[in-house]
């Protein structure tokens, strides 16, 4: 079976508030799908359920055809996540960070995997540097290496280039493009960077009020809504108080 992650009739409620309401989508092997929406629309809750960290009120998440709620331990070893809001242990070196994380996942040939990712992400010269002394761009690349240390088949990215300078952001995007081509991986990219989404994603999910209100390729969405670019489509989504379709 090819690698994939599928969300089926997924909902999450907190008391009387419905944070995510009956959403459906699938990310196939070797595909990056973008998730766009304003703050508070349900993106983070969706990612939490996809990772098995939040229990859905209704629906299910299938990873490679298996329900994550019923196969959580085995499936989480095939998944990983990156967010700029999760800090690295400041007193550990880069190498120590990768070793600790690799051992959590029981990674075979851990040293070889560290060497591979360090080369790809230009970490070789800072492997023995303490993480707390790194620049934001260096920390971002270390976080990405940690997220790939277990060679995941599913990768969930929450604002992976937030707060990065243009050069470092472009390096990370180029790395993700190449990594996807070289590895059989399904990727969800939640981002507010429209150029990033258009460059990396084969399709885009537009989310508002906990609902997927539209989806399609970036070019399809631009044409459908008669806009000049994806940013204008996003602004239409945010500003339109009525149904967006």
Predicted regions and their residues:
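Conserved ABC ATPase "signature" region
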Residues: 99, 103-126
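Helical segment within the ABC ATPase nucleotide-binding domain
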Residues: 170-182
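Catalytic Walker B motif of ABC-type/P-loop ATPase nucleotide-binding domains
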Residues: 155-158
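ABC ATPase "signature
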Residues: 215-216
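Conserved ABC ATPase signature
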Residues: 130-134
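Conserved catalytic motifs of ABC-family nucleotide-binding domains
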Residues: 151
């Amino acid at each position: 079976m090819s690698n994939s992650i599928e969300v089926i009739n997924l909902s999450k409620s907190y008391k009387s508030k419905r944070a995510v309401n009956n959403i459906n989508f699938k990310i196939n092997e070797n595909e990056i799908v973008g998730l766009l929406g304003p703050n508070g629309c349900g993106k983070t809750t969706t990612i939490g359920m996809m990772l098995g960290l939040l229990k859905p009120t209704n629906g299910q998440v299938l990873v490679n055809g298996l329900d994550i709620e019923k196969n959580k331990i085995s499936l989480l070893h095939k998944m990983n996540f990156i967010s700029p809001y999760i800090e690295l242990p400041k007193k550990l070196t880069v190498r120590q960070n990768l070793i600790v994380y690799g051992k959590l996942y029981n990674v075979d040939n851990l040293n070889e995997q560290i060497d591979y990712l360090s080369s790809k992400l230009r970490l070789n010269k800072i492997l023995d540097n303490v993480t707390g002394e790194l620049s934001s761009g260096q920390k971002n690349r270390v976080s990405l290496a940690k997220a790939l240390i277990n060679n995941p088949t599913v990768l969930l990215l929450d604002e992976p280039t937030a707060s990065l300078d243009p050069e470092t952001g472009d390096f990370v995007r180029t790395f993700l493009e190449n990594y996807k081509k070289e590895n059989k991986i399904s990727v969800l990219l939640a981002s507010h960077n429209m150029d990033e989404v258009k460059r990396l994603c084969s399709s885009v999910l537009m989310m508002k009020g906990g609902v997927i209100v539209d989806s399609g390729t970036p070019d399809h969405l631009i044409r459908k809504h008669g806009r000049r670019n994806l940013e204008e489509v996003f602004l239409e989504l945010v500003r339109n108080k009525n149904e967006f379709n």
